[in-house]
Amino acid sequence: MTALPGPLWLLGLALCALGGGGPGLRPPPGCPQRRLGARERRDVQREILAVLGLPGRPRPRAPPAASRLPASAPLFMLDLYHAMAGDDDEDGAPAERRLGRADLVMSFVNMVERDRALGHQEPHWKEFRFDLTQIPAGEAVTAAEFRIYKVPSIHLLNRTLHVSMFQVVQEQSNRESDLFFLDLQTLRAGDEGWLVLDVTAASDCWLLKRHKDLGLRLYVETEDGHSVDPGLAGLLGQRAPRSQQPFVVTFFRASPSPIRTPRAVRPLRRRQPKKSNELPQANRLPGIFDDVHGSHGRQVCRRHELYVSFQDLGWLDWVIAPQGYSAYYCEGECSFPLDSCMNATNHAILQSLVHLMMPDAVPKACCAPTKLSATSVLYYDSSNNVILRKHRNMVVKACGCH
């Protein structure tokens, strides 16, 4: 019996067909050597989107040819992806402390930028706004950061600067807007690099009012309280190179599993067990000089290759990484006696014994995953925000008899 992780079991044959055509990839034995038709491909795409927790295929806007250099948010998220992908042990510590227990990370690019730095009007400030409509409902925010790049200031020599961040709570027509303090960082005017401000406290408002974000406002002051134009302090905005533009990154603790829409499932035809009065021969332990075939050339329960190709699905216009991943599946015989290499449960051993006595009443034990791990997918949403999602129980790590 074949077992795939989670709801992927219905897609096994289709994915073999999709993944078998890539360079250097060999489909597992028994996979159909054909390409899917248009309708079948759409069905497979819809199923995988549901597994990934997406209601539909994202359609990001292609950037102009002149601005296709790497942008700051995707570069940062790609670093996070590699950190998360390196931590494939569900029980291990995360590769990066800032990831914490988050399994969903979203970045938001600066959509609107306002300045008050003209003439001698004070205080000076810079305001940023973001498209937060894609924030998922029902997710808990574990952290949120505003990242802005700073170059050395030639106007302030090496003075100490205080950079403060506020959330705009309510705009007023006849006075200053109502603000909520978020974070304060102290640095030197000659410093260079990414400045990170904690804006987690604003996340509750984002979750409640996705369509009414009034933005974040940044102030810079000297030690004596004099207001400084953020641009003169070396803080870059929308006019900066794409790799140095400001953005917000938010960490979520996602739901344990995506909510999948019900669909029609074709009933599987169950094969009738062959009647035999002969006891099966003992399975051989796989060793260096022999294969993993049991008696009569049948394979014992083990893990097989199953590659899911995002490239063959035509999704590389929105999936940043990876181009595909190995999901694997479990298949093979669980015949008595069950060797230690089969990772059999006590129940599987008992079921195998009863099957010997009553083969028509009790089926054999099943070959199924005994250990699953997560895989991470980095992609653009339809608003060109970059999303990093960790999907649990997507990769078979070990198989056994159940």
From Swiss-Prot:
Annotated glycan sites: N158, N343
GO molecular function, one term: growth factor activity
InterPro entries linked: Cystine-knot_cytokine, TGF-b_C, TGF-b_propeptide, TGF-beta-rel, TGFb_CS
Cystine residue pairs: C301-C367, C330-C399, C334-C401
A GO CC annotation given for this chain: extracellular space
Record key words, sorted: Chondrogenesis, Cytokine, Developmental protein, Differentiation, Disulfide bond, Glycoprotein, Growth factor, Osteogenesis, Secreted, Signal
Highest taxon listed in the record's lineage: Eukaryota
Prosequence residues removed at maturation: 20-263
Subcellular location: Secreted
Gene3D superfamilies named among the record's database cross-references: 2.60.120.970, Cystine-knot cytokines (2.10.90.10)
Pfam (any one): TGF_beta
Signal peptide start and end residues: 1-19
GO biological process terms, semicolon-separated: cartilage development; cell differentiation; negative regulation of cell differentiation; ossification; skeletal system development
CDD domains: TGF_beta_BMP8 (cd19398)
Task of the protein: Induces cartilage and bone formation. May be the osteoinductive factor responsible for the phenomenon of epithelial osteogenesis. Plays a role in calcium regulation and bone homeostasis.
Family: Belongs to the TGF-beta family.
Subunit relationships: Homodimer; disulfide-linked.
Full protein name: Bone morphogenetic protein 8B
